[in-house]
Amino acid sequence: MRRFLLFALTAGISIPIVACSPKQQASREPVVVETLISATESWNGDSFKYPRGQAEMKLEKITAQPGFKTPLHLHPQPGIIYVQRGTLYCETSDGKSLTVAAGESFASSQDTVHYCENNGDEDMVVFVASAGAKGKKTTVTTE
C-alpha cells in the first residue's frame, strides 16, 4: 500500500510539471501550408487553356531595375506571378491595369497583349511560374 501511495504522489506531482513545460507551450505544427493563389482565370478575366504538346513547367526569377519596361507581349499559357520585392505595374492594350506590391501574387493574363514595368525606386524581384509546352516560348513579343 505504501508503494502505491508513493507512486500516486510522485505521479501526481510529475504530471503537472510536464504539462507546464516550456517546450509543450511553444509547440507548433512542423509544417504549415498556405495557398498564396488559386485561380481559374487571369487577373483581367482571361480563361486559362493549356497549349498542346509535351507539358513543361517553368519557374523564372526576374530582377528588374527601376524604370525597366517590357515591350508589348503576351503569354500563350497560364502562369502565376509572385512579387518578392518592389512593385509591378502591368497594363493591357485595352487599358486595364494592375499594380502588385511585394508579398502579393496574381494569375497572369493569357493571350492578351500587355506590358509591365518597375515604376518604383528599387530593384523589383518577381517569380513567374508557367504551365506551357516544351519548346514553346512563354513570352511572345508583339512589337
Model-derived regions: residue spans:
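Sec-dependent signal peptide recognition
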Residues: 2-10
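Short acidic-glycine-tyrosine-enriched beta hairpin
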Residues: 64, 94-111
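Ligand-binding loop in jelly-roll beta-barrel domains
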Residues: 111-136
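Histidine-centered metal-chelating micro-motifs
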Residues: 69-71, 89, 106, 110-116
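Hydrophobic h-region of N-terminal signal peptides that target proteins for export
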Residues: 10-18
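A short beta-loop-beta micro-motif enriched in histidine and acidic residues
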Residues: 51-55, 67-80
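Glycine- and acidic-residue-biased ligand/ion/polar-headgroup-sensing regions
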Residues: 75-94
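A short, N-terminal "cap"/entry segment at the start of jelly-roll beta-barrel domains
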Residues: 4-5, 17-58, 107, 141-143
